[in-house]
Amino acid sequence: MKLVTRYFLVLVFSLLVSSNAWAQWSSDPSKNLALADNNDGADQVQPKVKPLPNGGWYVSWFDADPKSPPPVGYSVYLQRLSAGGVERFKHDGIEVAHLSNSSTEDYGLDIDTSGNALLAFLDTREGANPQVTAAKMGPGGKALWGARGVQLTKGSVHSNTAPKVAGTSDGGVVVAWTSDSNTVLQKLDPNGKPLWGKGVVLSETGYYYFLADLHAADNGSVIVSWVRNHGFGSDSQLRANKLSATGKLLWGKKNVTIFDTGSLQFGHFPYFVPDGKGGAVFAWYTSSPALQCFAQHILANGSEAFPHNGSAASTNMTDVRVDPAASFRAATDEVFLVWTEEDANQTVNGIYAQKFGPKGARRWGQTGLVIVPLGTDSEILPSNVQVGDGALMFWIDMKGFGNASIQAARLQDNGKLKCAQFPVSTAMSNRGRPAADIVTATGLAAIAFEDDRIGNNGIYIQNVNRDCSLGQE
């Protein structure tokens, strides 16, 4: 009997180990690693991805699981992956917060200096008016700030939207959000205790400050950006500042003007990337005077490395361009930009790229490099990560409804293709909201995305190795 029992336990253990080994990076672009694939008719949406220094990953998303206890809404979920793509939490992730949101807004994901996941989101658990909550989740999935996290707002007086979070180099956590017409920031210590009183409020009489992005910088500081306008229909422009570990405005009370001529496209809240030196690289596109993409590098002291209002991606005045994404090579102070190029009527489009030198000069020709020529497929939502001496660029190629794929190409510093266009995700489906990042130490990149191959949206992820192969090296 003991022998039978021992054999049974060994068999069960072997099956568990084998099944766990199956959940790893896929080498087949038609079979990407599924993180949340409940085909229950409810969507799993809006993934964010963050690499860990050890090569692992955190991925977060919203899930409106109809089987969850009422009230049913878009709840916050999290998964941790090993460097090999093995899920460390249960499949479909762990629930960070059970919410009743009927729709989603932007939110924040980052890591702290101890490798914990940090999340900031709108929280419906405290009443009718959504509040801003921050959560810290340990590598084992434990809620380190308790089941309800740290609530940063309260009451029904203020309207709060689109929070972001950043883990600072001194072990702290900064959360930013839009409150009415202002952008507000609060710093928390490792235990979740507020450090900046009632928060640092960025405001200007007669103007709205809508939070755009937030990232950690040097010496415990953060860089924050926002869209500035004075109401619907007015020009939207881009501002930024850097806050010290104690909340001091390091770039001055007048802030840094990233862009102040013309207007951002309506609804465009540009992300930026830290330069690793205390500064940041910004990319955005305008709707007036024309649909055009720009980049700017703001140095650690708040000065502009590129000309004021940024360097244009292309001097081609016939076409238009939208949706830029930037990456930065710290060793050479170069910026890589990828975007969607369109004809004047916006009936055909392609994927183009540009490299800027340290002072903003276009290095890949005055009109950029053509990765995908203008054509009838919709080439949308490009992103890129810096790798080697160049960049790895992703985009969605949509031939028609239900027939979209994720494609990629890797460019060298000289603009030549290190890897010609190759497929990353090819199952017949619609795809959206891709989020890409890279483990700098290993050069392994990953892109997470929404995908409706199961009938409703699920969350999938695919790695890309330095040699542009998929799966285990």
Language model features: what each stretch is:
Residues Y7-S19:
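Bacterial N-terminal signal peptides
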